[in-house]
Each structure stands twice: as structure tokens, then as C-alpha cells.
């Protein structure tokens, strides 16, 4: 769920999911269109695509469990949906950490109307 994802993001990046990633660029937050603005926004695009591959799951509300083993995120065994949601969130949180050096405050609260076009997963 968004609760676990937010916790993962904080652990990986040291940033609060809200406001740091809740409306960043064209893809971080609800919906998305256009070309990702930077590597962080691309992480969100890939995360949206990952969720899009889970049509029978509820990624924003389905809870899952994970732990840390030697600093690494390990998704704990749950239902098929829980496992796949956790893996999507894990990949995004790691992607955010790997791209912290290019995170730009100018893309926080980025206006939707500047995001044009369609990008296929």
C-alpha cells in the first residue's frame, strides 16, 4: 500500500514521500502523461507501468510486509498481489535512491499542463 511504499522511500532516500515524490515531474503522484522530466520522474513512470501490470490487484491499498536483510529490502511472502506490489515498490524506492544526485526541487509540484503526449510502457 502507499503506507509501506512511503516508508520504503524514506528508508532508501531520507526523504518523505509527501511532498518529495507525491507530485514530482510528470509521473510521480496520481496519473501521468508526457515525457519524464528526469531520472527520478522516469522511476515513477516505470513504477506506474509496474502497477499497470497488476490489473487484479489494488497497489495503493493492499498491505504487504517487508524486512531488511543487511540493509536490503526483502519482500516477505504474502499473496501473489502483495508480493508483486512489494516488488514494484522496492524497485521504485531503490531507483529513487540511485537517482538522488539528479533530484531537482524545480520538478516538485510540477504543473500537469506542462506534461504532453503519451508514452507507452
From Swiss-Prot:
Disulfide bonds join 26-115, 28-44, 43-95, 49-121, 50-88, 57-81, 75-86. This is Basic phospholipase A2 VRV-PL-VIIIa. SMART domains: PA2c (SM00085). The keyword Ligase does not apply. Oxyphenbutazone (OPB), anisic acid and atropine inhibit the enzymatic activity by binding at the substrate-binding site. P-coumaric acid, resveratrol, spermidine, corticosterone and gramine derivative inhibit the enzymatic activity by binding at the substrate-binding site. It comes from Daboia russelii. One of its GO terms (biological process) is arachidonate secretion. It is found in: Secreted. Binds 1 Ca(2+) ion.
